A protein has these predicted regions:
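Short helix-onset patch at the extreme N-terminus, typifying the N->h transition
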Residues: 7-8, 28, 150, 159
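Gram-negative (and chloroplast) outer-membrane scaffold detector with strong preference
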Residues: 59-138, 146-150, 182-184
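Short glycine/proline- and aromatic-enriched beta-strand/turn motifs that initiate or cap beta-hairpins
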Residues: 20-70, 74, 173-184
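Detector for outer-membrane/organellar transmembrane beta-barrel domains
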Residues: 31, 99-105, 117, 159, ...
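Outer-membrane beta-barrel translocator domains and adjoining extracellular loop/strand segments
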Residues: 38-47, 87-95, 131-138, 156, ...
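Cleavable N-terminal export/targeting peptides
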Residues: 1-25
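Transmembrane beta-strands of outer-membrane beta-barrel proteins
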Residues: 25-33, 76-84, 119-125, 155-161, ...
Length: 184
């Protein structure tokens, strides 16, 4: 029992010293996401007649939580919902679409001034939704956080996630968002 207490004490001490100088950020945001994908119906003959294209233009609501360390290392988790029309170009069908998008991002934050942060992040992303069922990809994120005081500011972010989907083959999801940001 004493070993567990000592281990927990040292684990808390090490973690608290690791994250001693950091910013925890919370950022709800709204934006736009464009998702496209294509599926080759006949892999033996990949002509343009054998390819289904899917395009979705969606409104987007997202919530972001992250840690920005004093040395610039950044870890961000974000999750959002998108809804809007989707188009299947071969049959020219318009269908409703909705997606859940989640990303885990690591990278670096440049701090040119005390209240201006520029993020360059990458990681792993997942999209679940209708009519495209699943996308697993690698997002690239560029963000600008401009704080007006010690605790609040403006978040402007663009993310592009290229990946492999099911039932689609290659997929791409581009998102632009804006919203308030809070620094704890």
């Amino acid at each position: 029992m004493k070993k567990n207490i000592v281990f927990c004490f040292f684990a808390v001490a090490i973690l608290s010293s690791l994250f001693a100088d950091h910013d925890i950020i919370l950022a709800p945001s709204v934006g736009y996401t464009y998702t496209n994908a294509f599926t080759v119906k006949n892999p033996i003959n990949p002509s343009s007649e054998n390819i289904d294209y899917f395009k979705a233009h969606n409104g987007y609501l997202e919530f972001t939580v992250g840690v920005i360390l004093d040395n610039g290392f950044t870890y961000i988790e974000d999750a959002g919902f998108a809804a809007g029309p989707a188009y299947v170009t071969d049959s020219q069908m318009r269908v409703p679409s909705f997606f859940f998008i989640s990303r885990s991002l690591l990278g670096y934050t440049f701090k040119p001034t005390q209240n201006l942060y520029i993020n360059l992040l990458t990681g792993l992303g997942l999209t679940l939704g209708y009519p495209q069922v699943l996308q697993v990809g690698m997002p690239v994120n560029i963000g600008l956080f401009c704080f007006f005081n010690k605790k609040s500011g403006l978040n402007i972010t663009a993310t592009d996630m290229v990946g492999i989907g099911f039932p689609s083959f290659l997929t791409n999801a581009f998102t632009v968002k804006i919203g308030p940001i809070f620094r704890l």
